[in-house]
């Protein structure tokens, strides 16, 4: 076995061991043991590695799928815990830095906006939808406060309790960012005419856990979004043990033109895919040598510097944020 194969085997074995330990936990609610295991997992998955999760053995693929579901459940419990904690403050939005990964949301949302601005010039959406917003809708909050100050945000989640927690966070800011936020308990598969109202739809990484589920969600969006509307999808190709991977071809088959694919460096975990609802002429096949229609993926570099190397301590606690980042 050559050195690279040994490295791949060692990493898969390590992650499988962490997955087994997480699966045996009596609860995924925040605790020292839960925090330790997930810190170990993220520390193992973030550095660049030669592992291609699409080529895992069936056994390891089942392990990966089980791990992603555990990550999803734990993330939900972590966000619910901190949503309840933040709700105890008179001004919850002044204390967002208490959440240990808040800085990651700041950087990810900035990245998504700058990719949109680069590939959809002049974009100034009146309404956007965020599908899979959860109890701590940090992404919508950062986008609304720092990048899209005139935009109305409709946040969708399957969980009514998650939406109730989110509403409490904005209750004290009804005349500010909160005035542009609404929360809806719904399955995206049940949305039809509503989707035609949005200039941009953001699809969270954990909406559609399996590849088939994700492709079905994207196809549904493609059937009901208006031509020219933008779709921002979170994927995780370099960190595919943490989140589902989205194949750009599934986005094309769903009726979209893929504008850009960005894989993260440093602290940002998720890959980002920016697409646009295609017009009928584009859906019929390649036109005038269109590279996107032929299937060429425009892999792009980051629009700003996100290449700072993450240190282990950043996984255990949030980096100290500037006053500007917390001023809502």
Swiss-Prot record:
Its EC number is 2.5.1.43. Pfam families: NAS (PF03059). It is an enzyme of class 2 (transferase). Keywords: S-adenosyl-L-methionine, Transferase. Induction: By iron deficiency. InterPro entries: Nicotian_synth (IPR004298), SAM-dependent_MTases_sf (IPR029063). It comes from the Eukaryota. GO terms for molecular function: nicotianamine synthase activity. It catalyses: 3 S-adenosyl-L-methionine = nicotianamine + 3 S-methyl-5'-thioadenosine + 3 H(+). Gene3D superfamilies: Vaccinia Virus protein VP39. In roots but not in leaves. GO terms for biological process: nicotianamine biosynthetic process. Signal peptide: none annotated. Transmembrane segments: none annotated. Belongs to the nicotianamine synthase (NAS)-like family. Synthesizes nicotianamine, a polyamine that is the first intermediate in the synthesis of the phytosiderophores of the mugineic acid type found in gramineae which serves as a sensor for the physiological iron status within the plant, and/or might be involved in the transport of iron. This is Nicotianamine synthase 1. It comes from Hordeum vulgare. The gene is NAS1.
